[in-house]
Amino acid sequence: MTIMRKNHPLLKLVNSSFIDLPTPSNISSWWNFGSLLGVCLIMQILTGLFLAMHYTSDTATAFSSVTHICRDVNYGWLIRYLHANGASMFFICMFIHVGRGIYYGSYMLSETWNIGIILLLTTMATAFVGYVLPWGQMSFWGATVITNLLSAIPYIGTTLVEWIWGGFSVDKATLTRFFAFHFILPFIITAFVLVHLLFLHETGSNNPSGLNSDSDKIPFHPYYTIKDLLGVLLLLMVLMILVLFFPDVLGDPDNYTPANPLNTPAHIKPEWYFLFAYAILRSIPNKLGGVLALILSILVLALFPLINSSKQHGLVYRPITQTIYWIFIANLLILTWIGGQPVEYPFTTIGQIASIMYFSIIIIFMPMASMIENDILKLHY
């Protein structure tokens, strides 16, 4: 079996990726989130597939079909809530994964990092089009507001929006194409995941010390397979508590009202995992400026490998940058909170300050702190 595992054309790919992969011996539980994201992706594809068997992408029947899934399909309620809350778990894992990458300097593996940013954007797109499918009030108005942002693009904006809508408003054509996008995008994500892993295995994993670990590697199996399995069990436990006890805690009550183009909800807001970006969008009074800030809030991550001036890998031995990093995380939480609040004083002002802080920390304060630390340690080589 050992020979077959190492020589078989298909099995040797699995072997070199998950069994005999040389892995740093000191990677902590923060490195578990990659495998958890893989589990989330597989779970989302499977639950989504079963939901697609019963869902109809037609404005007249979409809302009813979701109700039918929850009421009449065997364990349909379970599949539906696993899918909805699974998306939340997916984003929690993804945010932690990115946060770990920033903390431990994993962005220096630039190809892996850039594919990761593409993955984040694609996942956000998938979640957005998926949120439209139940055809509740927040689905409809979320789709209307967010797609309408494209009209801020000079000259071609309005034409582009109507082209995406397939008409003059969000309607049957929009819902049908969003369902098509929502079905195909997870498979595109899976392809990007394979490229992400390909680039990661070219260089090998980073580790908490930030030092070269070539002299201290252990095989992935059994050490990290068992460690990842523990992570998966904890993830599933949290997910099942969410699904079975608090299935609607992360959703919006407005989405239990069928979509009505004649009645606007009091507060239009996206799912919790988009609130930080939504707060940044709203903090700029100009439409085009807001759209650019929204896009840059994710694309700014691509600057990390370029503006890193530290002579050390990661923040483990850099107390000044560490402090700034945790301020950045707190700032993100403030943005998430503001994104869910109404557009009025003092929330607008707090949102504007937090948005300025978000970009300033990444572009100004972190590089400055790195230079100060280099100077303190006299690392001028």
UniProtKB/Swiss-Prot annotation:
Q: Which GO terms describe its biological process?
A: mitochondrial electron transport, ubiquinol to cytochrome c
Residues involved in heme b b562 binding: 83, 182
| Co-factor remark | Binds 2 heme b groups non-covalently.
Transmembrane ranges, per UniProt, are: 33-53, 77-98, 113-133, 178-198, 226-246, 288-308, 320-340, 347-367
Which cofactor is essential here? heme b
Which locations, inside or outside the cell, does it occupy? Mitochondrion inner membrane
Among the entry's GO cellular component annotations, what is one?
respiratory chain complex III
Q: Which domain of life is it from?
A: Eukaryota
Key word Heme present: yes
Which keywords annotate this record?
Electron transport, Heme, Iron, Membrane, Metal-binding, Mitochondrion, Mitochondrion inner membrane, Respiratory chain, Transmembrane, Transmembrane helix, Transport, Ubiquinone
Record-listed a ubiquinone binding positions: 201
State the membrane topology.
Multi-pass membrane protein
Q: Quick one: which residues bind heme b b566? A: 97, 196
Gene Ontology MF terms in the entry:
metal ion binding; ubiquinol-cytochrome-c reductase activity
Q: How does it assemble?
A: The cytochrome bc1 complex contains 11 subunits: 3 respiratory subunits (MT-CYB, CYC1 and UQCRFS1), 2 core proteins (UQCRC1 and UQCRC2) and 6 low-molecular weight proteins (UQCRH/QCR6, UQCRB/QCR7, UQCRQ/QCR8, UQCR10/QCR9, UQCR11/QCR10 and a cleavage product of UQCRFS1). This cytochrome bc1 complex then forms a dimer.
Q: Per its database record, what is this protein's job? A: Component of the ubiquinol-cytochrome c reductase complex (complex III or cytochrome b-c1 complex) that is part of the mitochondrial respiratory chain. The b-c1 complex mediates electron transfer from ubiquinol to cytochrome c. Contributes to the generation of a proton gradient across the mitochondrial membrane that is then used for ATP synthesis.
- Could you say which protein family the record assigns here? Belongs to the cytochrome b family.
Q: What else is known?
A: Heme 1 (or BL or b562) is low-potential and absorbs at about 562 nm, and heme 2 (or BH or b566) is high-potential and absorbs at about 566 nm.
Protein name as catalogued: Cytochrome b
- Naturally occurring in which organism (per UniProt): Phyllotis limatus (Leaf-eared mouse)
What taxonomic classification does the UniProt entry list for its organism? Answer: Eukaryota, Metazoa, Chordata, Craniata, Vertebrata
